[in-house]
């Protein structure tokens, strides 16, 4: 029973870290990535479709993304969808491809990105701590219902704390690495 609880708790904590990493993809760092286009969709024959489903997307350099649609009639549709998405880039449609030029990030923008990232990290830590609380509540209930002894309860709570410390430490490590990446000019 306790092993199942430990595994469940660890799975939930790992999920919180993965959710934070997915959220980080929306942050702008010093280098542009194709993930800035993940939420841009176009009307493709009546269906909302992601850009990577209608053409190739590649990063040309630290501030430029090139979109080559497989159907040239989509150029204007893609251009307008990007403009409406307000992703901070200027689309340049040359008739065969679209180039997105992102301005270099200012120090203030970098600091704002770090601030957002730390908020996401704190949110993940709160989720991990909530998972710990839920697991400890289940352990205490099992002890109260006489399913486990007081010693087993204490040992199980210590184990849950070790798992929590592992994931909090992992979040801190990821935050430190990401902060250095964002602030690097």
Curated annotation (Swiss-Prot):
Gene Ontology CC terms, in alphabetical order: cytosol
Family: Belongs to the RRF family.
GO MF annotation: an example: ribosomal large subunit binding
Keywords linked to the UniProt accession: Cytoplasm, Protein biosynthesis
General function of this protein: Responsible for the release of ribosomes from messenger RNA at the termination of protein biosynthesis. May increase the efficiency of translation by recycling ribosomes from one round of translation to another.
Pfam families membership: RRF (PF01765)
UniProt-listed InterPro entries: Ribosome_recyc_fac (IPR002661), Ribosome_recyc_fac_dom (IPR023584), RRF_sf (IPR036191)
Coiled coil: none
Protein name listed in UniProt: Ribosome-recycling factor
Compositionally skewed regions (Basic and acidic residues) per UniProt: 131-155
Disordered: annotated span: 131-156
Gene: frr
GO process annotations (BP): cytoplasmic translational termination
Subcellular location, record wording: Cytoplasm
